[in-house]
């Protein structure tokens, strides 16, 4: 049985790690390199870096820190932000990232997914899906890194997830925007609905506030990993303790000695 992944998420803006609530009111958390090293040493299974200003501002993320991250940590990491072409992705992967993630650019031009998969392989290509419950239904949102530039699309998350899979993406990160940063737990029902409609790995994002939330998302959905930010940045949850509790609850996890 594959182990479930614990994935700290580092939102990057203007060269530092930040965190907001429901994608708004971001506060500075700290240095990218130091936090990456901290989470790697603590036993995280993977890291995700989002340059949250890149897509809304129509620019590629700064890549100067990626090579340094690759030198410092020994776990896989994924990088996202403003990737609009094979050339953009190649620059990031060449610096040492293991995966790249696309979101808004894939919504604008879905063929981008096919092109990235053809060039780099399924295992390198992640698609982020920002899902928001609006007027009684879930819709996929775009350009969510900036409050005044966020766009609600006409797509429902299940249909978009199916298309993403059909185009060859290797993984989906489903971020439930209504739950983001509020620490009330993952949206189990929505995660389950999307996960049951695709066969590729789905990563849960948005809502972690305590260890029980991680236990619940792994027990009551078949997602492959859980992404979180605030609980790790604010030292609410220590990754070694989280891993031990998952193990006690018969959830397969990698324990760091």
Residue ranges of model-derived segments:
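N-terminal amphipathic alpha-helix/helix-capping segment at the start of soluble metabolic enzymes
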Residues: 1-22, 132-133, 255-257
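Active-site-adjacent beta->alpha loops and helix N-cap segments on the catalytic face
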Residues: 2-6, 54-71, 84-90, 104-126, ...
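Structural preference for beta-strand elements that scaffold enzyme active sites
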Residues: 5-9, 46, 74-78, 99-101, ...
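Conserved, mostly hydrophobic/aromatic
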Residues: 11, 39, 47, 92, ...
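Conserved anion-binding
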Residues: 12-14, 18-19, 97-174, 178-179, ...
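N-terminal beta-alpha supersecondary unit
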Residues: 17-60
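Short, acidic/polar
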Residues: 28-40, 85-91, 153-163, 211-214
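Catalytic cores of alpha/beta
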Residues: 73, 77-100, 189-226
């Amino acid at each position: 049985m594959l182990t479930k992944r614990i994935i700290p998420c580092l939102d990057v803006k203007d060269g530092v790690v930040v965190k907001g609530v429901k994608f708004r009111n971001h506060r500075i958390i700290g240095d990218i390199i130091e936090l990456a090293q901290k989470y790697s040493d603590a036993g995280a299974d993977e890291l995700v870096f989002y340059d949250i200003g890149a897509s809304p501002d129509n620019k590629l993320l700064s890549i100067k820190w990626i090579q340094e991250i690759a030198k410092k940590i020994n776990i896989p990491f994924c990088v996202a932000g403003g990737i609009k072409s094979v050339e953009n992705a190649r620059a990031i992967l060449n610096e040492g990232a293991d995966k790249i993630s696309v979101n808004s650019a894939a919504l604008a031009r879905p063929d981008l997914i096919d092109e990235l998969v053809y060039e780099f392989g399924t295992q390198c290509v992640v698609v982020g899906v920002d899902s928001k419950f609006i007027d009684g239904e879930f819709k996929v949102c775009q350009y969510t890194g900036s409050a005044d530039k966020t766009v609600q699309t006409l797509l429902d998350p299940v249909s978009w997830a199916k298309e993403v899979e059909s185009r060859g993406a290797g993984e989906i990160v489903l971020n439930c925007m209504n739950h983001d940063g509020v620490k009330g737990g993952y949206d189990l029902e929505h995660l389950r609905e999307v996960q049951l409609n695709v066969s590729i790995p789905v990563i849960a994002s948005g809502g972690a506030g305590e260890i029980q939330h991680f236990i619940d998302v792994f027990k009551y959905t078949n997602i492959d990993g859980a992404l979180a930010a605030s609980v790790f940045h604010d030292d609410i949850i220590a990754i070694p303790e989280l891993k031990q509790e998952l193990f006690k609850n018969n959830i397969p996890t990698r324990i760091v000695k």
